[in-house]
Amino acid sequence: MDPETCPCPTGGSCTCSDPCKCEGCTCASSKKSCCSCCPAECEKCAKDCVCKGGEGAEAEEKKCSCCQ
C-alpha cells in the first residue's frame, strides 16, 4: 500500500502530513501538505483530495478539490 494514502473507515481515502482529520486513519509517512477523507464521487483525485464545505447541492460542487 502507498504509505501516503490510507483507507478511511468512511470508505474514502486520506493523505496525511499533519495529524489526519479522518478518524481512524493513520499514515506512516507523506510528502503531501494536506490530509482529508474523500467521498466516493471524488475518487478520481482521492490521493490528493481536500474535501471541505457543508452538505447540499451547492456545497457538493465546491466540496472536493485536488492538492497541487
UniProtKB/Swiss-Prot annotation:
GO cellular component: cytoplasm; inclusion body; nucleus; perinuclear region of cytoplasm; synaptic vesicle
Modified residues (Phosphoserine): 33
Beta, as annotated region: 1-30
Positions contributing to a divalent metal cation 4 binding: 34-35, 45, 49
Keyword annotations: Acetylation, Copper, Metal-binding, Metal-thiolate cluster, Phosphoprotein, Zinc
Positions that bind a divalent metal cation 2: 8, 14, 16, 27
Family statement drawn from the similarity comment of this UniProt entry: Belongs to the metallothionein superfamily. Type 1 family.
Protein name: Metallothionein-3
Organism from which the protein derives: Bos taurus (Bovine)
Upper classification of the organism: Eukaryota, Metazoa, Chordata, Craniata, Vertebrata
